[in-house]
From Swiss-Prot:
Pfam families: TusA. Interacts with IscS. CDD domains: SirA (cd03423). One of its GO terms (cellular component) is cytoplasm. PANTHER family: SULFUR CARRIER PROTEIN TUSA, SULFUR CARRIER PROTEIN YEDF-RELATED. The gene is tusA. Pathway: tRNA modification. Keywords: Cytoplasm, tRNA processing. Belongs to the sulfur carrier protein TusA family. It is found in: Cytoplasm. The keyword rRNA-binding does not apply. PROSITE patterns: UPF0033. This is Sulfur carrier protein TusA.
Length: 81
């Protein structure tokens, strides 16, 4: 079984940050990425379980994978056009 979270193009450590900081940091990081690149987000704010998927839907990026059963939460986002 392959680890979908292995070898992302970029990593964002949002541990210890609380809403709305994680999503603000994701937005800033994604702006500087090229289409098709991936971003691994590591967070421990329970609000990210709602905010990160919502951000991906709203901005039309792909949420490739998420792990929210245990801390820290992990999300893998792929930037679209």
């Amino acid at each position: 079984m392959t680890d979908l979270f292995a070898n992302p193009d970029h990593t964002l450590d949002a541990l210890g940050l609380r809403c709305p900081e994680p999503v603000m940091m994701v937005r800033k990081t994604v702006r500087n990425m090229q289409p098709g690149e991936t971003l691994l987000i590591v967070a421990d704010d329970p609000a990210t379980t709602r905010d990160i998927p919502g951000f991906c839907r709203f901005m039309e990026h792909e949420l490739v994978a998420s792990q929210t059963e245990t801390l820290p939460y992990r999300y893998l986002l792929r930037k679209n056009q």
